[in-house]
UniProtKB/Swiss-Prot annotation:
Coiled coil: none annotated. This is (E,E)-germacrene B synthase. GO terms for molecular function: magnesium ion binding; terpene synthase activity. Pathway: Secondary metabolite biosynthesis; terpenoid biosynthesis.
Amino acid sequence: MAASSANKSRPLANFHPTVWGYHFLSYTHEITNQEKVEVDEYKETIRKMLVEAPEGSEQKLVLIDAMQRLGVAYHFHNEIETSIQNIFDAPKQNNNLHIVSLRFRLVRQQGHYMSSDVFKQFTNQDGKFKETLTNDVQGLLSLYEASYLRVRDEEILEEALAFTTTHLKSIVSTMSNNNNSLKVEVSEALTQPIRMTLPRMEARRYISIYENNDAHNHLLLKFAKLDFNMLQKLHQRELSDLTRWWKDLDFANKYPYARDRLVECYFWILGVYFEPKYSRARKMMTKVLKMTSIIDDTFDAYATFDELEPFNDAIQRWDANAIDSIPPYMRPAYQAFLDIYSEMEQVLSKKGKLDRVYYAKNEMKKLVRAYFKETQWLNDCDHIPKYEEHMENSLVSGGYMMIPTTCLVGMEEFISIETFEWLMNDPLIVRASSLIARAMNDIVGHEVEQERGHVASLIECYMKDYGASKQEAYAKFKKDVTNAWKDINKEFFRPTEVPMFVLERVLNLTRAAEPLYKEKDAYTNAKGKLKNMINSILIESVKI
């Protein structure tokens, strides 16, 4: 028999207050014409440099890699696409580990399948990598980064990862500061490989590394710095607009039980897409994510079951008239929630893209149903579901199935109905991304959640169903995360079912799980590492 929720105290979580308050309200600087002209002049110089570099040459490979890592490749999408296609179509023989690894990574990043057999020349008769390679630090680093583009059953790349990780850890501990640029690059890579790093974070860290590299191109470096600072101004202005919206709602006071994390939500979405053309989409998606966070905390950290039943019904009805059926304290949030989607409809109806909002609403309804399912389990005498049942629900309740669809709504590109239908059917790349976020979140957060009477996590369900220890459950989940990354890599191989820019949104969303959930739940506990990351991307400009 279900326990009476009326007799239960509210499951308050006592989240810490906002780190940022209304700090970004004052960031209203516009990008000047002089800044635009200077960036455009550098851009044309760099474009000419890229086009004139011989096709397939080491010079072109190194240049493209630097552009991508410095965060300016979005300016040269077509030129880079053509260059990588040419490299893939006419591969050149090379026995330089650095160049072979770099070419492999660039080609796979672009969605072309290049066989990992290209690394066989660096192995001995036993299939092990030759010990002589340990003298080539740059080559080891490039092979290490390439190994993160592996898919399932690529044993040579598994061997490559183990081999390079072992030797790079040993080498970096003994490297002198004379090689400081390379030492920093190796240390950073061992902590966070390129494939798993958010593009803005990679740009910020690589600008410093690249500047200290004696072989750097000073024009490209200057361009990257100017572009970073110009984009930062745009992002600050967007966050200023969003902060005004958030302040006007006054939800920090109306919903003190919820995590007040507007800036963190924006940073999350900035990870999904940072380019100027996605400004409208970023603001739309940040509002959706912020309201989702309030709804999530209402389910997890405040409302009773008797309050959540009509609230879930109201979301499923998606009707302003349903507002009278929900508790008074929920009504401002429900109205603001409806208003966000109405605003989307007003903007997109003028562009003939109203169908996008239909799919976004569907995903949000599905997400709230998943929240409610967890509430039902908890209300049913703390029912612990079977692991497989919990997994299917958790892949939805983590939000990583809602975001890929909703983040497309405000984008300028043509996106077909077929693409939205594809997303609705939970494709492998979206399931893999959802699994990564859910597993990482549960590993760092499940013990705290259990202390405040949260529904059993996937960790607890796995331990119960399979008689596993906590450490065994952690090991299983970490292995699942590794395999999910391999599935994401495979889904990028051409021909793809949907445009590459759609897959890139899912990839970047997955990358966002790293800073949010790698060591702790940094969204919930936002005072430490995440605060520093936000500071480096959204406050501190790069010194020219």
